């Protein structure tokens, strides 16, 4: 959600900023802008729309060796040129970009900016104007910046230019991700490592309530008291080629195809020298010894948690609750005496989940983060971390992170079961390998998935997904995939709930997708399909081999039914992809959505 890039060095700042912002497009945005500094001053270019639109307005003749850039996802003020970043102070001395939400911007405006006319509706402009007011009152830029930061309530990642000191970028962070990349004759600032890989893979992580003074040959980190902080740098595990589409038309299709490889990598990563599945002993003990586990997630991660709940309860015999992070913060349930909290987040930066983590840590409870990004905020602040090893996921619609979360939760449940002396009844390593092969076979049947999308979703405005047991949890994920990238109103329902209200929405031609992978509910879900078909629905049954009937539209390869969610979701991902494609939608960057939701 939003992105920041900054550069100061010897190269063309404009192009580095624009390329960096392109690497942050996956985070979601509605406008973009850059500010570059040279001997003539600070030049600001911004535009509503895509980075391609911004490129059209950037003056190619302006040469600069330093700059800051931003992609905006509207929180305060509509998407517009005036609300796009960078923002400048009234006298034009300061230029600033900001990610996050300043909760007390109205109070700051009333207290410090009574005589300043604001040009935008944003909370961000208030920050840059307050800085200038403090400088006008006699403070040096660094001190004015620090004083302003101490006043801010909320989340922020900020990069600031001073027109009187154009060889320096002032940076600060609180509850919004920001990294500083290191080079021999340059330094860069970015919301995540993907934006800086074009020039460096070495970076320093910033902690909350820290500020940084960045020049082309120096990075000085300070706390808000002005004390200098020394911190070791990291080498990013990513390679620039990891974040390219290659021959694929869209990242979503590429990432769907990568799922079998991710499954095999998870198997390999979580095997010990004897080929047995393993996680660090303290994590296994935390799961096995908990009297109740609370899985916290948002969107797709929440859906993965629903599947993980079944594994942990069925195999490890530990009760589990799954909660939407944004609701948990305000409606915390009565907690057990020895809980363990598991946080699912692809990015490790989800603000709603982090808010819950802060709450439960304050209560003294243990927390495990399962994430795709090492060193992310949720990873750093939890007691334990398990990594998904899925590689960068760029498309807004999650595919491989979802199946990776399910696989890692399965591994965790299996290890906890073993620690509790429970035999789960099958070889999970072998069955995950079979599931990976099945996923690969499904990825090779794209023509069939495209045909189903054309047949059922070409003119549809609504669609329903029904299932029972584990299939129901996959249905809610399939519905989310369809609605978020094709803009078709789609909902997933438990098959038995149809008669309690939802069936009233069924009319002639309504597409209804049904999953049938669980033997104990196979007859029941087929009965539900007959109910909606009798009312005119256009039904599509996707069944598991061995449970299939002659009239089923598509049959999945045979896998262990417990792991069917890893396999049954792949057709739903591809059907959603082709439905969006045929409707002319932006598959990788759907409207109004952000990949990494870093504000509550």
UniProtKB/Swiss-Prot annotation:
Give residue ranges for domain SIS.
Answer: 283-422, 452-590
* Predominant location: cytoplasm
Q: Which Pfam families match?
A: GATase_6 (PF13522), SIS (PF01380)
- GO CC annotation: cytosol
Q: Which InterPro entries match?
A: GATase_2_dom (IPR017932), GFAT (IPR005855), GFAT_N (IPR047084), GlmS/AgaS_SIS (IPR035466), GlmS/FrlB_SIS (IPR035490), Ntn_hydrolases_N (IPR029055), SIS_dom (IPR001347), SIS_dom_sf (IPR046348)
Reaction(s) catalysed by this chain's protein: D-fructose 6-phosphate + L-glutamine = D-glucosamine 6-phosphate + L-glutamate
Keyword annotations for this protein? Aminotransferase, Cytoplasm, Glutamine amidotransferase, Repeat, Transferase
Instruction: List the catalytic residues.
Output: 2 (nucleophile), 595 (for fru-6p isomerization activity)
Q: Which GO terms describe its biological process?
A: carbohydrate metabolic process; fructose 6-phosphate metabolic process; protein N-linked glycosylation; UDP-N-acetylglucosamine metabolic process
Its Enzyme Commission number? 2.6.1.16
Compartmental location: Cytoplasm
Tell me the ranges covered by the Glutamine amidotransferase type-2 domain, including all copies: 2-217
Domain of life, per lineage: Bacteria
Induction annotation: Constitutively expressed, part of the cdaA-cdaR-glmM-glmS operon.
A single GO molecular function term of this UniProt record? glutamine-fructose-6-phosphate transaminase (isomerizing) activity
The protein's role, per its UniProt record: Catalyzes the first step in hexosamine metabolism, converting fructose-6P into glucosamine-6P using glutamine as a nitrogen source.
Assembly, in brief, is: Homodimer.
UniProt-listed HAMAP family: GlmS (MF_00164)
This chain's protein is named Glutamine--fructose-6-phosphate aminotransferase [isomerizing]
Query: Encoded by which gene?
Result: glmS
